[in-house]
Amino acid sequence: MVCIPCIVIPVLLWVYKRFLEPIIYPFIGPIISRFWPTNIAVQENGTGDVKASEKSNGACKTKADVVVANGPSANGPATPISDKKID
């Protein structure tokens, strides 16, 4: 069994959106736009360091990549991992 607000609220929202908003919005739209201005999306035109972007090529090289490539034994003996919580 569905609760009453689960039926009534969507119906009221539909009635507002369909019938009341086209009548009310032209009057309150200018008032709302003063308080809540729309932000225009700005696209950057590559003003950053071009050489740095050419070198990186979109790949992130970290120290962890080197360890995986060389294997864990390249950095010395592996330390045992404890399953117990240490406070």
Swiss-Prot record:
Pfam families documented for this protein: DUF4512
Family: Belongs to the UPF0729 family.
Protein name in UniProt: UPF0729 protein C18orf32 homolog
